[in-house]
A protein has these predicted regions:
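Conserved NTP-donor binding/palm subdomain of two-metal-ion nucleotidyltransferases/polymerases, i.e.
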Residues: 2-189
Length: 189
């Protein structure tokens, strides 16, 4: 977290606020979250399963030569395995949605990840984890949202439901995202 304070030097920023699993700050008007714990699930058994998968994914990230790297303007950025990322980014958006509001940008992030890395997703592992962590129906509704409203090709949605047409639940989900606004801070302007 000391590194974040160094990033603030000479920039407009809001003092960083810490909570049990992340540091939240604003840097030049952009919200930044640095997680010390990737996330957690409610329920001891599900959380233990998720923490184990997180550790295995991070070990794979830093302990093998299969490291996925994104070139961010000449700076290499290590990426977690696509299967873990596909789950984690959606789970993170759902946590925000159920607590403080979710930014539509987070759904776009997940959609773009699937568009770029769908071929690298281990569908069998993802299906098993979605079932174990009780996220199958959530995956399907967000998938309908990504395909029906954001233009993700159905072929790029791992474990796509048979019926991808946005239904009542998908429209309710979309309405909730727009009402809750950007992390609960809706601004009509």
């Amino acid at each position: 977290f000391e590194i974040i304070e160094g990033l603030h030097e000479g920039r407009a920023h809001k003092k960083a606020a810490e909570c049990e699993h992340h540091l939240h700050t604003s840097l030049n008007g952009v919200d930044v979250e640095i997680h010390r714990l990737a996330s957690f699930l409610h329920g001891k058994r599900m959380n233990a399963n998720f923490q184990k998968w997180t550790q295995e994914s991070m070990d794979a990230l830093f302990g093998t030569d299969r490291l996925a790297v994104w070139d961010n303007g000449g700076t290499p950025v290590a990426l977690a395995p696509a299967t873990y990322n596909a789950f984690f980014i959606l789970h993170h958006a759902v946590r925000h949605m159920t607590t403080e509001g979710v930014g539509f940008r987070q759904i776009c992030d997940w959609t773009m990840l699937l568009h770029r890395y769908h071929a690298q997703v281990d569908v069998e592992l993802l299906g098993r984890k979605l079932k174990e962590l009780h996220m199958e129906r959530i995956w399907q509704e967000f998938g309908r949202l990504a395909v029906g409203f954001l233009g993700l090709p159905a072929s790029e949605l791992p474990l796509a439901p048979a019926d991808l047409a946005p239904g009542r639940k998908t429209h309710e989900l979309l309405r909730h995202i727009f009402i809750s606004g950007n992390f609960g801070r809706f601004d009509a302007n």
